[in-house]
Amino acid sequence: MASLATKALALIALLVATVVTADAHDERLGAVTFPTSCAPTVQAQFERAVALQHSFWFGEAIKGFNAVAQADPSCGIAHWGAAVAWLGNPLAGPPTPRGLAEGSAAVARARSAGAKTERERDYIAAIETFYKDHDKTDHKTRAVAYEKAMEALARKYPTDREAAIFYALALNVTLNPNDKTYANQLKAAAVLEKIFAEQPEHPGVAHYLIHSYDFPPIAPKGVTAARRYAQIAPSAPHALHMPSHIFTRLGYWQESIETNRRSAEIAKAELRQTNLEAGSYNALHAMDYIAYAALQLARDRDARAIVDEVRALNKIDSEQFAAAFAFAAIPARYALERRAWGEAAELALHPKSLSWAKFPQAESINAFARGLGAARGGNLAAAKQEVTRLSSLAYAMATAKNAYWAEQSEIQKLAVSAWIARGEGRNDEALALMRQAADREDATEKHPVTPGAIQPAREMLGELLLELGQPAKALAELEASQKIDPNRLHGLAAAARAADAAGDRAKAKSYATRLLDLTKTADSERPEIVNAKAFVGAN
């Protein structure tokens, strides 16, 4: 049962919500209420740090929590905040070794400082369940233990909305990527939707609702949160990026470009204040989404500008997985979406200074792009070398118990192997391999780090069937792919061709018209656009 003092604090919180602002810069981070027993003079500063944390601005959040602890050494809950921030993006994977060390130290400082209320001590104990024995217990086990601790905390203090919000985030961290009922996600969303109605300016609620709905069948439920989040916390780079998770799911490419451009600009501006030579991993993450969206609109010059900017970077401000992923994905997407097979086959890992061995799941993208480019470009020997490389990377990830990404590499290997089989005339085997890749990809979910598969396997299956003279079957696969990845340029183009070849001129014209509408701001004359114009003009 929550104490009367805690209930009183919660009541005060409902009456007086702190809108987090910074006078010097007119900072807008949203409205957060987190009552504490710390000195009243640090309360607003503490809530600002919590708001920064809810928008995944980890470095600034850590600075904020540490400043609170320095101003009020007895404020143990400030060290709790730092420990939470040192997790980094919990949806992207485990913390870095430094994050684990710093987070553990923050928990120890929280214990030493001594929180004045049972509620605050419970928060500290909850985060301690994640860091405890991190050198002996695997990440997943500790993440689940933390989720259960936050569930207990939220139940113990039913009027404490922050406890419920952090619990909802924990549910998204521990979700089963193979669960197509989306049990954890919908459970989290139910918690968050209730709070969203009460606190429509809360950054964490909108943020975590987007993550909860970031899955094809339920993505439309996230539109409201997506459109609100950037308005709630426009000073935070991640808040400007996050709406694009939903926009991408629904094929709203221009909206994705616009919100990610703002996100990247803020992230790069922040970095320029401290480091003029390194790239920002926050900006790179947004730039991957921009490039992906621009390529769907055939805005190839816009995408090329992103590629050139990435290639000019020789180091990164923080070796985060999101940065490594973007470094590998952006040039791969640029080559493959333009069907520049030779260019894809020659892609090199960049920058060389990055510790690529730490990120085999990112290196796998490079191997996939090189392999697919070589296979479809006719260099089957080179493609087979990349299949071997993908096998090694998948094995390394499986050995490290990184099952999700090991499976993604296996799917990539199957796809490249399918096109190799096609190149060698083993057409039945090619179809079997590609269907296996598509089915296995459908059985998993997109990771939050990526706007989408580098090349969707079911879309490739449709293209392969079309190439092998089976247009009706191709159309069925392409339409299924569009349900998962709507408004993809190549998906629409292939569907138009398949429908035409299958004798359905009306459907072919519909897809071709959609393609032309999609690419009306194109800055390149892709063959797909030329063909669609000719078809629509003749029909």
Predicted regions and their residues:
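Bacterial N-terminal signal peptides
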Residues: 7-19
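C-terminal structured "cap/appendage" subdomains that terminate the fold
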Residues: 460-533
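TPR/TPR-like (Sel1-like) alpha-helical repeat modules
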Residues: 76, 83-87, 95-115, 248, ...
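Short coil/linker segments at helix-helix boundaries
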Residues: 23-159, 166-236, 240-249, 267-290, ...
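Generic long, charged, amphipathic alpha-helical segments
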Residues: 412, 430-482
